[in-house]
Structure formats: structure tokens, C-alpha cells
């Protein structure tokens, strides 16, 4: 399915009852082919979706609510278009379910089917909201650099690394990531964390490269995969992990993570802007 056929940018009709058919899958293959990715992925990882506007009725008609988190594996053949995800979650509002577990099971079944892979689902009930974390991405901030730039389309030539020096291990972060929805043109604001082991990456060039996404159109997942591949090819790190946390839209935030080495899942802690 093409993004142009999704609910994005079209008049919205809210479903009166639960409707799994609202989910609109988009194949990852098209964007990956443009990046030169063949069948064998050069990374693995997860897309972490947080949903803050999930509510349903219990068996007696009383509204219930939860914050939902979906863990979509990067190897899944599809992503779900975000507005369709919002409409799908909204369709639960006037539908009755016997328990929280029943809601979780339905969410897992439907989203897994749309993505074409097993998706993990967690629901946090109101009595546990106090346990939800908020913290900034850990690492050395690139935004401290005072520099000039005029490149606002992705340009990997901005990237360089000191290949003739000893390898280093660094974690670098920036809050200056911005890209744009390929269907509506709406800006997507995010923060990005880059951890690597290898030749030291030029910090100013990396920040200019991150800023260069400012006028780029692409879904969150596609932007992170492009960042990962450009750094991998231009700087040749031995190990690389890229994690972005995008601000919320329509009650959803999307947080893609890509890596080429075994490590634990990054913390799903909201940043201040989320």
C-alpha cells in the first residue's frame, strides 16, 4: 500500500466501534530499496510506539484507559501509517472489553497482522502512571557547537572520521533533528542519539548532517535508517547504534532504534519535548 492511499491528509471519519481494518500498513521495502538495502538488513532493532490516547469501556460500560507501548521489530515487512494507527486506537473508545488483558491481546493480534511480524504490547494503567520515566537522551550534546550551515537536505558528504587515529567510543546526542511527513509535509521534531566504536567522527560535520534533514521528507523509521547507513558508509564505525525520539502527534510518538551489534533495548523514557 502506498502512503498516498492512507488516511493522511484526508477528511477524518471517526469509527463508532472497534475496527481493525483501519490499520494501514506501508511496506518498508520501497524506502529501503532507495537506500540500497537488499534482502539482508545491515542492522536490527525496534520501532517503539507510545500511545497516550487509548480508552475503552469495561463490561459495565465504564470508560477505562491506559498508556500503550508497541515494540515493532525492524525486520517486519511493514510499518503502520500513524494516522491510521490513531484512528484504529480511537475505535476502541465505545467498545466493551472484559479486561485489560483482552484489550492487550486484541492490540497485539491486530498490529502484528498489519506489520507482518510479532509485535510486543505493554499497557500501563493509571495507578502505575507515576512509574513512567522522563529523561533526556544520554550523551555528549552536539548542539553546544557554534557553527554555520546552509545545507537542509540530507548530505552524507558532511560526514567524516579520523581513520588514521586510534578508535574511540562515544555517545553523541542532538535535539536539532527535524524531518517532514512525506504525505502532508508537516514537520516532525526529534532528538537523536548516536553511539559508536571506531574512528572518531567529526562532531561539527555530524551536527551539520543531522541539521541537513530539516527539509527532508520521510517517515521517522526511514530517516533513522538513512542516518544509520550514511554514518556506517562514511565513517566506517566498528559498532553503531542510532536511536531517535520524535515528538508526539495525534497521541502517538515514534522512536526508532537501529544497531549492528548486540545490546539491550534502549530505555523508553519520554524526553521533555515528548
UniProtKB/Swiss-Prot annotation:
InterPro entries: GTP-CH-I_C/QueF, NADPH_dep_7-cyano-7-deazaG_red, QueF, QueF_N, QueF_type2. Keywords: Cytoplasm, NADP, Oxidoreductase, Queuosine biosynthesis. It catalyses: 7-aminomethyl-7-carbaguanine + 2 NADP(+) = 7-cyano-7-deazaguanine + 2 NADPH + 3 H(+). It is found in: Cytoplasm. Its EC number is 1.7.1.13. SUPFAM superfamilies: Tetrahydrobiopterin biosynthesis enzymes-like. Substrate binds at residues 80-82, 220-221. The keyword Nucleotide-binding does not apply. Pathway: tRNA modification; tRNA-queuosine biosynthesis. The active site is at residues 181, 188. It holds the Pfam family QueF_N. GO terms for biological process: queuosine biosynthetic process; tRNA modification. GO terms for molecular function: preQ1 synthase activity. Belongs to the GTP cyclohydrolase I family. QueF type 2 subfamily. This is NADPH-dependent 7-cyano-7-deazaguanine reductase.
Amino acid at each position: 500500500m502506498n502512503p498516498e492511499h492512507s488516511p493522511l491528509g484526508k477528511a477524518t471519519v471517526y469509527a463508532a466501534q472497534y475496527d481493525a481494518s483501519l490499520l494501514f500498513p506501508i511496506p518498508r521495502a520501497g524506502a529501503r530499496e532507495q537506500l540500497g538495502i537488499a534482502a539482508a538488513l545491515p542492522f536490527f532493532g525496534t520501532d517503539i510506539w507510545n500511545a497516550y490516547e487509548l480508552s475503552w469501556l469495561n463490561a459495565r460500560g465504564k470508560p477505562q484507559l491506559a498508556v500503550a507501548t508497541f515494540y515493532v521489530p525492524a525486520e517486519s515487512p511493514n510499518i503502520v501509517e500513524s494516522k491510521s494507527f490513531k484512528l484504529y486506537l480511537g475505535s476502541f473508545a465505545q467498545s466493551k472489553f472484559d479486561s485489560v488483558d483482552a484489550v492487550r491481546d486484541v492490540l497485539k493480534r491486530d498490529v502484528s497482522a498489519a506489520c507482518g511480524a510479532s509485535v510486543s504490547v505493554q499497557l500501563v494503567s493509571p495507578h502505575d502512571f507515576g512509574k513512567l520515566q522522563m529523561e533526556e537522551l544520554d550523551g555528549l550534546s552536539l548542539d553546544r557547537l557554534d557553527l554555520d550551515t546552509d545545507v537542509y537536505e540530507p548530505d552524507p558528504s558532511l560526514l567524516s572520521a579520523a581513520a588514521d587515529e586510534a578508535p574511540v567510543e562515544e555517545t553523541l546526542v542532538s535535539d536539532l533533528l527535524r524531518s517532514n511527513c512525506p504525505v502532508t509535509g508537516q514537520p516532525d521534531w526529534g532528538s537523536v542519539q548516536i553511539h559508536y566504536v571506531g574512528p572518531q567522527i567529526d562532531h561539527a560535520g555530524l551536527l551539520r548532517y543531522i541539521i541537513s534533514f530539516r527539509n527532508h521528507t520521510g517517515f521517522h523509521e526511514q530517516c533513522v535508517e538513512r542516518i544509520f547507513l550514511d554514518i556506517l558508509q562514511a565513517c566506517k564505525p566498528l559498532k553503531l547504534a542510532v536511536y531517535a525520539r520524535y515528538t508526539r502527534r495525534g497521541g502517538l510518538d515514534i522512536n526508532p532504534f537501529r544497531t549492528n551489534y548486540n545490546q539491550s533495548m534502549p530505555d523508553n523514557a519520554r524526553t521533555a519535548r515528548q
